Amino acid sequence: MLRHHIQLSFHRLFAFCVSRRYFMFKRGLNMTETRESTTAKLCSFARAYHSNTGRQKIFDDYLAYDLMGKEEYEEIGQLIENDFESEQLSINYSFSSKRIIEKLNRYIAPIPLSRIAFAENKLLEFAQKHGKCQYVVCGAGMDTFAFRNGNPDIHVFELDHPNTGRYKRERVKQLEWNIPDNLTFVPIDFSTDNMTQALLDAGFQPDVPSFFAILGVSYYLTLPVFAQTIGEISGLCTADSQIVFDYPDETTLSGSGAERVHTLAEITEKLGEKMMHGYSFREISETLERYSYEIEDHETPQMIERQYFENRTDGITAFENIHFILADRRESA
């Protein structure tokens, strides 16, 4: 019964990942494609813009612009310029960098740039230690790691809705990119599919060291659902495995929270994606302990500031409420 309950919660998480990041619309020969949601496109835009224009690069996602495409890039630039009011977008207008840079650097760029830098650095350390390993990207969307990856020993599994995978593969085809041999798209229909079985059917090997990334998701989940998600991953992974994620702390929606934290919450709610309250470090620590994980690295906002934003001249600073976690799965007693 508990296993079934955890599985359902994991389904809710990934169904959420899909619904948060994507929506259906009519276009093209098949009349249905899947596009990223606005907040996910904001993150893609931040990586693309930073890689194209940033002088002090926090993270160089040099393929983000190509995969996103000029049309969507311009659309999101306009959205930021127009204070996140989508009704004012125009296909005949290009956004002004001068008009978006302050809002982009203050509200949008800090979290996605620093968390992907943290996650991929930890992944590379994991791969260096273990050699052959598996990287599971939960709700991969327009993630580009598999196409930037130069290590053939890292096998990438991208979990997403079937329509999402088709849309991404179509973009890759349009760009004439080759799909690497060590990339596997894992389609998940959560009304019918079991995540564990889908991964196993796709070639996931439980006895191979595995690294799971769940980025940008905890903001929108209650602690019980997120906790049960950790439990499901723990049941799938071997002892030589790690999980990485980011989370907002308990100050997120409190009266004492920073101004821009509240502003970002207002922006995401305006875009139809309401943030939940944050978690305390104690809650996170106890949750991981319950499912045989031990925290290897906890990056506080102050540590993130020193690691990624110190001495910058562009005004990008770490968010006051965001933490990064890397956890090891240990052998059960």
What are these regions (language model features)?
Residues 24-136, 142-186:
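Rossmann-like AdoMet
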Residues 38, 256-333:
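Rossmann-like AdoMet/SAM-dependent catalytic core
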Residues 189-194:
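Conserved acidic residues
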Residues 195-206:
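Short amphipathic alpha-helix with an adjacent loop that forms part of the alpha/beta core around
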Residues 213:
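A conserved beta-strand element that flanks and buttresses the S-adenosyl-L-methionine
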Residues 221-232:
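A short, conserved alpha-helix within the catalytic core of class I
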Residues 237-248:
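Conserved beta-strand signature within the Rossmann-like core of class I S-adenosyl-L-methionine
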